[in-house]
Amino acid sequence: GRTCVAAGARLHLIEPIGFQINEKQVRRAGLDYWDKLDYRIYDSYRDFVEKNPGIKIYMATTKARHVYSEVSFEDDCYIMFGKESAGIPEELLVENQENTIRIPMFGEIRSLNLGNSVAIVLYEALRQHGFENLNKQGNLHRLSWDN
């Protein structure tokens, strides 16, 4: 969620997500930005597709043949990630194999942390579009860069 807020991206959650949005533990996990998060929840993958007709979906998986950085992300595309424990169902991957992408990894590592994977791929898509609408320069708290 925090990565989506920082990137100005909408988070789409497809049930079952394994937690309740209003759970005390979720809020306690540092989600003080939750009120700034633009998110939607769908009952199923079919519900998601029906409510977002004609969309281009890239599916991030360790099983893909294409590297994420070799894709030209469209401005209005969606990037799908599966559950950290199981990934995206293989039936969906086979149906969408030309749009599956992976992050290269060394050796036989199973996968990266889900949040890290989202950040890597999302920020590549944003980079390709010049980080449009994002702050590209930070400010010091006590001093000025001009000193």
Regions found by a protein language model. Give the residues of each.
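Post-transcriptional modification and biogenesis factors for structured RNAs
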Residues: 1-147
